[in-house]
Swiss-Prot record:
GO terms for cellular component: endoplasmic reticulum; endoplasmic reticulum membrane; endoplasmic reticulum tubular network; nuclear envelope. The keyword Transit peptide does not apply. Signal peptide: none annotated. This is Protein mono-ADP-ribosyltransferase PARP16. It is a single-pass type IV membrane protein. The lineage of its organism: Eukaryota, Metazoa, Chordata, Craniata, Vertebrata.
Amino acid sequence: MQLSNRAAARESVSRDVLAADLRCSLFASALQSYKRDSVLRPFPASYARHDCKDFEALLADTGRLPNLKELLQSSRDTDKQTWDLVSWILSSKILTIHSAEKAEFEKIQQLTGAPHTPVPIPDFLFEIEYFDPANARFYETKGGRDLIYAFHGSRLENFHSIIHNGLHCHLNKTSLFGEGTYLTSDLSLALIYSPHGRGWQHSLLGQTLSCVAVCEVIDHPDVKCQTKKKDSKEIDRSRARIKHSEGGDVPPKYFVVTNNQLLRVKYLLVYSQKQPKRASSQLSWLCSHWFMVAMSLYLLLLLIVSVTNSSAFQHFWNRLKR
């Protein structure tokens, strides 16, 4: 078992270190959340004792994980528990994640519709591929229907669960236009719901990340949106509103998916918050202590005026001019 976990973890990291790093970052973000009992799902069974989740032990072991490049270069003496934990984080029976070229972002923009306003290019881009039977089941549900591509924004801590369990309509808290999973064709809108959050301290991607999901959505009547009737310019009212909607029709650029089987995450856009440069830190310190700086400069000015008006200084100055 020890060799199996070590070999599996090494193989995953060697194949795509950035994708492996992303999984560790999403796991760490969920673990550090105050909602960790609900967002850290799945949870490693080896840390569940007597029907209780040992978060403290898991936090301690996660805190000891080196960055993945260092882990690859480490000797075989590396703690078994480290390899077991990394192997668990990187394992999945239903999907695999791999890093994609930034040029793929242009393809995503075409799939979701060209943006009307400039949008930030992600620092990292990842694609998710699903194994059978999950992949076959999705295409069986799709049948001959088209696919819609749209963005879903959420807090970083939620993505560990989103990746492994999918997006669930009943868990969505944004319900102004009815119960469902909310998506948008506008990346700038999705980013509002994806604030930067604390990830993994040893991440190669960065310690503070923002993540947006690009979803594949089956064009089905259970996907509510502003769409026109077939062969008509008239809005299809049956798809524009959800039953018991408090806000009326679903607004343009939004999609509300009311059936979990109709969508899945296909890409992940990751934005890394850059660390401020030293000069920026110094400027920030000056801004924070502006009153003290102003008073110091004022006192220095008074001292200069006092010295220049003294008789000793006048005598010295007159001798210099001779």
